[in-house]
Amino acid sequence: MSHKVSKKLDEEQINELREIFRSFDRNKDGSLTQLELGSLLRALGVKPSPDQFETLIDKADTKSNGLVEFPEFVALVSPELLSPAKRTTPYTEEQLLRLFRIFDTDGNGFITAAELAHSMAKLGHALTVAELTGMIKEADSDGDGRINFQEFAKAINSAAFDDIWG
């Protein structure tokens, strides 16, 4: 059944998921350990309790090998991605605001290139100058060189930051 669900995702969504998956697959063995999956979830702002995490692992690990492979990962996240309510805005405004505040380290209502670089490095994803400038350019729709909350929310919801994970 999970295979049928994944067929409904478009190629771009599958590629984005693959990039996210690969960036957290530290040893590049094609599977995520529980530690790697936990890091991925935290980077996405999802912080399940230990019980919720165990349930998530049990649900995802269909081979019962203690690892989450890419098809299992796709099967796990596909229902969320395909849900009509989630398709246009995968995050609540509260979640986006919380995430925005993490990146807006000085609290002035804008994310600068320096704040973005620092926050991504803290999340374990150091950015090259090209990645950093590309992300700012992609998200900064008014061209002022910084990202306000509306630009941030739009970028996150449209996966404009997919280069973060690659």
Swiss-Prot record:
Residues 12-47, 48-83, 91-126, 127-162 form the EF-hand domain. It comes from Arabidopsis thaliana (Mouse-ear cress). This is Probable calcium-binding protein CML17. Keywords: Calcium, Metal-binding, Repeat. It comes from the Eukaryota. PANTHER family: CALCIUM-BINDING PROTEIN CML18-RELATED (PTHR23048:SF52), MYOSIN LIGHT CHAIN 1, 3 (PTHR23048). One of its GO terms (molecular function) is calcium ion binding. SMART domains: EFh. The keyword Zinc-finger does not apply. Ca(2+) 1 binds at D25, N27, D29, S31, E36. Ca(2+) 2 binds at D104, D106, N108, E115. Ca(2+) 3 binds at D140, D142, D144, R146, E151. Potential calcium sensor.
